[in-house]
Amino acid sequence: MRKSTDFIANIDICKEYDARYAADEVHYETFAGLAAFFGRDMQVHWHDCFFQVHFLETGKIELQLDDQHYSVQAPLFILTPPSVPHAFFTEPDSDGHVLTVRQELIWPLLERLYPGSNLALDMPGICLSLADAPQELTALSHYWALIRREFGQNLAGREQTLALLAQAVFTLLLRNTALEDNANSGVRGELQLFQRFNKMVDERFREHLPVP
């Protein structure tokens, strides 16, 4: 199902691409797998309530990330926080991995990595080449293999293992990014307020009694 805010599609991959995983906190698919379903010319869209990582091992991407344009050769990663609009185009030789994670798993991670900052809600979108980071590429190769295995099998502790692996991938990628609290946010004002409201509800709802 796609919702629209000012004609920007909100794509919920867990429901629209594969409804079997609609309730999952972590969703994994190859880049080529999603491209076969959605196409390689992705018009501007966003993912409400989800952080997403696109990691390209091969090919090149033309990316519009909020108001910034990128033309980057693999290996690279793109990290899009909830509600950050983005669009991209790739050729058939572009492939890699896509990790979609519910914001409730990433918010605490950002608060631990950047204590006292507002990055949990104000984080900009990121596009970064990893061509000069061979150690990170080796580590990520192991993580992707583990994530793909866990996601594709119904093993004991699957949900917890996927959550930990997803947080590890985000941590590794963020270590290679110079994020500052005063960085320009890619989140539009009204969507940022909506995110703040959602986060407050998520943190406080257990403190209140249900309405009869």
What is the role of each PLM region?
Residues 1-64, 68-70:
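Generic protein-terminus/edge-of-domain signal
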Residues 2-25, 89-152, 175:
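A hydrophobic/aromatic-rich effector-binding and dimerization subdomain
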Residues 52-55, 136-143, 165, 169-172:
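Amphipathic, well-ordered alpha-helical segments in soluble domains
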Residues 53, 77-79, 98-100:
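Conserved hydrophobic/aromatic beta-strand scaffold that supports enzyme active sites
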Residues 60-62, 69, 85, 95, ...:
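Structural motif
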Residues 62-64, 80, 86-91, 97-98:
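Short beta-strand His + acidic residue motifs that chelate non-heme Fe in jelly-roll/DSBH
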Residues 67-81:
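Short acidic-glycine-tyrosine-enriched beta hairpin
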Residues 131-134, 151-162, 173-211:
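Short, Lys/Arg-enriched, Trp-marked, Pro/Gly-tolerant hinge/linker segments that flank
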